Amino acid sequence: DRSRGLGDVYKRQVKELDSRQTLVKKVSIVPLEVIVRNISAGSFAKHYGVEEGIVFEHPTIEFSYKNDALGDPLLNTYHALALKLATPEEIKTIEDYSFRINEALKAFWLTCGVTLVDFKLEFGRLSDGTIVLADEISPDTSRLWDVKTHEKLDKDRFRRDLGGVEEAYAETVSYTHLRAHETDQYL
């Protein structure tokens, strides 16, 4: 059931110290980057030779091996298991959390007039082995498009030399500030 709350995903967070700092528990990082995709864009469109903007009937998950020396290659769950990057139970938990986070983020961004195209996640293990979200979720880790115009509101503006990076980020921040008081309903 992907509609459950996300409290179990955030067990790492102890408390917010201020608007820019959060006290968290130490984790050992699972060396998998998880990319959740709702719409074809970026490397997905390039790798599979499809147009950007195709809305998927079901979101997809891609894993890449967090290894700079190897260029963070894409891999599937069988590769992750063979390389002992995670156990079958951990992979299942990571996939479940990723889909649940996706549903919450899509709902939140839609209220802001923004489409969540895709985003990346990183997970870690607490000292007791519990899998938790271990990295930020932000416009820097997400691909966001204006619902009506499909204007890119994320770092693709920089990557593709579209200009207006600061303005797009400011617009995104204004969306989130307008809805910040409502975020509990998505968690």
Listing of model-derived features with the role each one plays in the protein:
Residues 36, 116-135:
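Conserved metal-phosphate-binding beta-hairpin within the catalytic cores
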Residues 137-179:
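C-terminal helix-cap and adjacent tail motif
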